[in-house]
Amino acid sequence: MFYGEYQHSVDAKGRVIIPSKFREGLGEKFILTKGLDNCLFAYSLEEWSNLEAKLRSLPFTDKDVRAFVRFFFAGAAEVEVDKQGRILIPQNLREYAGLEKDVYIIGVSTRVEVWDKSKWESYSGDENMSAESIAEKMAMLGI
């Protein structure tokens, strides 16, 4: 399980340090793909395989399912952690998420997310993230 948030910087070559707590769960190689809300999602190879199986079971005849599967898989890349604990974020994924310099790397249960610093600060400060709003949504979900 992944949790917590860490600030790091993307270097001139597009590399970023992955926090050691996250590296342990993700492994030396993992999948990085386009996420929702204009961030990136990172999955361990095992979790990616589980997600792939779930997506494969969805009805291929549904246009929205096909669009979602394309979005998720077309942007995916296998990345490898170097000896300094960094990964190279592919250019297309950096552009998608607007990653230029400062980033937040956050743990979200079964995945890790990589956010542009200003986007994360805006999103996490948004009313959708207020304690009251979250409590209401949790109650609606029976949590």
Curated annotation (Swiss-Prot):
Location of the SpoVT-AbrB domain: 5-47, 76-119
GO cellular component assignments: cytoplasm; nucleoid
GO MF annotations, alphabetized: DNA-binding transcription factor activity; transcription cis-regulatory region binding
Residue ranges the record marks as coiled coil: none
Disulfide-linked positions: none
UniProt key word Cytoplasm: yes
Biological processes, Gene Ontology terms: negative regulation of DNA-templated transcription initiation
Keywords in alphabetical order: Cytoplasm, DNA-binding, Repeat, Transcription, Transcription regulation
The keyword Oxidoreductase is annotated on this UniProt entry: no
Subcellular location: Cytoplasm, Nucleoid
Record-linked InterPro entries: MraZ (IPR003444), MraZ_C (IPR035644), MraZ_dom (IPR020603), MraZ_N (IPR035642), MraZ_sf (IPR038619), SpoVT-AbrB_dom (IPR007159), SpoVT-AbrB_sf (IPR037914)
Gene3D superfamilies per record: Transcriptional regulator MraZ domain
Family under the similarity heading: Belongs to the MraZ family.
Record note on quaternary structure: Forms oligomers.
Family annotation (NCBIfam families): division/cell wall cluster transcriptional repressor MraZ
Protein name: Transcriptional regulator MraZ
Protein source organism: Acetivibrio thermocellus (strain ATCC 27405 / DSM 1237 / JCM 9322 / NBRC 103400 / NCIMB 10682 / NRRL B-4536 / VPI 7372) (Clostridium thermocellum)
Gene giving rise to this polypeptide: mraZ
